[in-house]
């Protein structure tokens, strides 16, 4: 018997969930995994992760919120609205139509990555997660899978800083934390799969550093 939906774990910490959901995906489709944006500090690990990271992990499951919205800051509420709009736009791709690909294993390194590709290979959503920030870490290339090698794709990389990163202390040191920051360019499928998407560690730092 296969349940249409299951609660994979009471552990809703975003960093831990990359392992939980990555491993579960070997046996069950991601649409069957209950995945929520929960409160921080996490009730089990007492770890605080940005609300953007929690959503970015929860997207690849059923997606929902498990927290008191009244306790969120204005910046976090703005992020929630953006997250809901994103999920409405891509829910069918992620939960119904798409094929799921595991790109980087959380059990083998500091990064986790996975993606979903539509059946006709015209659309895809990929996610890259960094566990811990490292000093002077080199660039990495996120190599995608499942694309049409001969198709030209419009690539959009969301580099918008985390709302939790938008503090006076951060601004004092000159980090750019203002507004939506999306990098776009065109590339063929074979380039995205063989050469990959170049990722500057400074871009990951803008997302909030750890997690």
Language-model segment annotations:
Residues 106-149:
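Carbohydrate-binding surface patches
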Residues 58, 126, 155:
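Conserved, mostly hydrophobic/aromatic
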Residues 1-70:
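Glycan-recognition surfaces
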Residues 132-211:
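C-terminal beta-sandwich/jelly-roll accessory domains of carbohydrate-active enzymes
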Residues 10-20, 36, 86, 153-157, ...:
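Short, surface-exposed, polar/charged, turn-prone segments marking secondary-structure boundaries
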Residues 1, 41-45, 66-68, 74-76, ...:
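Flexible loop/turn segments at secondary-structure boundaries
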Residues 55-104:
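Catalytic cores of secreted or luminal carbohydrate-active enzymes
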